[in-house]
Amino acid sequence: MNTREVELRGHIIDSLILPRALDIIMDMGGDFQILEIDIGKRKSDPSHARILVEAETPSLLNQILDELGEIGASIAEIKEAELRRAPMDRVLPDDFYSTTNHQTFIYHGGEWVEVEGIEMDCMIVVDPESRTARCKPIREIKKGDLVVVGREGIKVVPPERPRGKQGVFEFMGSEVSSEKPLVTTIKKIASEITEIKKRGGRIGLVGGPAIVHTGSAPVIAEMIRLGFIDVLFAGNALATHDIECALYGTSLGVDIDRGEAVSRGHRHHINAINEINRAGSIRDAVEQGVLTSGIMYECVKNDVPFVLAGSIRDDGPLPDVITDVMEAQNEMRKYVQDLDMVIMIATMLHSIATGNILPSRVKTICVDINPATVTKLSDRGSSQAVSVVTDVGAFIPILLHEIKKMNGLGD
């Protein structure tokens, strides 16, 4: 029998980490012995468990240890993290370690070193001179980089669920469902947003064109103007239709106020792109007085950065759209590590793309009328996301109303 001792520390009972660990061992065909367990008696007390993991083969044992590592289990006997040099650009050494989106440490030089820029599905590269470790995607690996391999000397710390009330993240902790009280949910989200902003935190918005189609662009624009959005991630579509709405009062040629298609309205979004091209950029259009309202206008006027990532289906695109997806991803990376919350609204593509580079400590709200969007986001590793399955046209105005009420801003 092949064995290895692992440890779990923290709120392992409340966060269900201990039962998940035991389930993993048994479901994968292993066995276990609990060697020691110390359960915290007060709300602030962490718990600790030592577990002997048993498996029939070394290969199975390693597979179990890999799965346990992803939920925060660490090998009990501390050894230095093993490093090997990358043999070529964009080529990894065998048995490389692939990161989760949880806070991660490696044991290097006799001390635990936190991995900087953590995100899922990346490699840990160590700089021996500065004694630092940071995440790198495979495309950024250079020949000679010292890459962490194996399982030794790696500690993963998932977000814990402390005892006590946790606002919307406790309330919404069940499966994806539309059968949840919408207004109550929105009030809790508004409360979280208010608390984050009061302590100087930062909030990102990931938005799809349905925001404009449902007539909610002025509401998001007001949220930006009031300082509740600190960065915007979107695609060509949201920006194009927002500008179309600002210039012509339509979205995809449909009058926003009357809900009716207008004559030759199918040209409006191309007209909008043409006007921005003529001005030079979205910022130029604002400064020249061409664009005087809307989401993109408020971003420019309030110095809120935006990243517009292109896709293969884009019309135009607008000159501000980054058509190289790797470049767009790197631009998004500049902002995600400093965020405290991300609100994802009606865009499966950009929500999942953002989720892939978000640390798990960032509170994440995903709003979509399609339950598959929030399910796919969670399935792809963004387990910290909570879902609101509803029409964004109903969600956004109520959210702003509650935020303004909580902050004494009137209506």
UniProtKB/Swiss-Prot annotation:
Reaction(s) catalysed (UniProt annotation) = L-ornithine = L-proline + NH4(+)
| InterPro entries hit by this protein | ArgZ/ArgE-like, ArgZ/ArgE-like_C_1st, ArgZ/ArgE-like_C_2nd, DHS-like_NAD/FAD-binding_dom, LOR/SDH_bifunc_enz_cons_dom
Names of the cofactor(s): NAD(+)
Transmembrane region positions?
none
Give the record's keywords alphabetically: Lyase, NAD, Nucleotide-binding
Which family is this protein grouped under? Belongs to the AgrE/ArgZ ornithine cyclodeaminase family.
Looking up Pfam families in the UniProt record yields:
ArgZ-like_C_1st (PF21571), ArgZ-like_C_2nd (PF21570), Saccharop_dh_N (PF04455)
What are its E.C. numbers?
A: 4.3.1.12
What is the name attached to this protein's record?
Ornithine cyclodeaminase
List residues binding NAD(+).
N236, A237, D315, T347, M348, L349, H350, D368, D391, V392
Which species?
Methanothermobacter thermautotrophicus (strain ATCC 29096 / DSM 1053 / JCM 10044 / NBRC 100330 / Delta H) (Methanobacterium thermoautotrophicum)
Respond yes or no to whether keyword Hydrolase is given for this record: no
Role according to the record: Catalyzes the conversion of ornithine to proline, with the release of ammonia.
Q: Determine if Mitochondrion is one of this entry's keywords.
A: no
